[in-house]
Design a protein with these regions (language model features):
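GST-like domain detector, emphasizing the conserved glutathione-binding G-site
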Residues: 1-121, 172
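GST-like fold's C-terminal all-alpha helical module
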Residues: 91-190
Length: 190
């Protein structure tokens, strides 16, 4: 979400490719240090950058830091809000994505089948990966039945505050997006 929104806002052309392809495993992954991660970007010259923050920072350096606040205070606030958004909101993101089957299952199945479309049985691979996330990844992030109510109440309180802010300002720090706005897209997308 962070990188996609940054690229769209800055009219930087891109195309998304599934990360479960032979090209990804044989070409991109070794250049990314053997560490899987989404997002990972491969440039036409073969360079690879893995991690949303690193990708946005790369384009910011080429873009005269267009979305990086110029004052120390605003820069610190922007980076703090970015970290809170992209890391601190991961738990509610995972909860709402994976614990509401009636509204999300079809989307998730489609999404994961798309990732594995070049494999012999994309439906089975998608189902297996989804089960792995539910059974292992979510509990590792503290997304367990005992925390669902707390996650939801804290998330609703935060959304209420964000709604109050964004009803007066189009972005976190005023009239143009900053790094925090792109970071907020990470947990809000999908």
């Amino acid at each position: 979400g962070r990188v996609r929104s940054y690229l769209i806002k800055n009219r930087i052309p891109y195309s998304e490719k599934p990360h479960a392809t032979p090209h990804y495993h044989n070409v991109v992954l070794p250049k990314a240090g053997g560490r899987r991660g989404i997002p990972t970007i491969e440039f036409p010259d073969g360079r690879v950058i893995r991690d949303g923050v690193a990708i946005v920072d790369h384009f910011e350096s080429l873009n005269d830091n267009l979305h990086s606040p110029s004052t120390v205070r605003q820069s610190a606030v922007s980076r703090l809000l970015d970290a809170i958004a992209s890391e601190g909101l991961l738990r509610p993101c995972m909860h709402y994505r994976w614990n509401h089957d009636q509204s999300n299952r079809e989307f998730l199945q489609f999404h994961f089948e798309t990732i594995y479309k070049d494999h012999s049985n994309p439906s089975k691979m998608a189902a297996d990966r989804m089960q792995e996330i539910r059974e292992n990844v979510n509990p590792a992030w503290g997304v367990v039945p005992e925390t669902h109510d707390l996650i939801e109440s804290m998330h609703v309180a935060l959304l209420t505050k964000l709604n109050q802010h964004f009803s007066k300002h189009p972005y976190f720090l005023g009239s143009k997006p900053c790094i925090a706005d792109f970071g907020m897209m990470a947990p809000m997308y999908g």
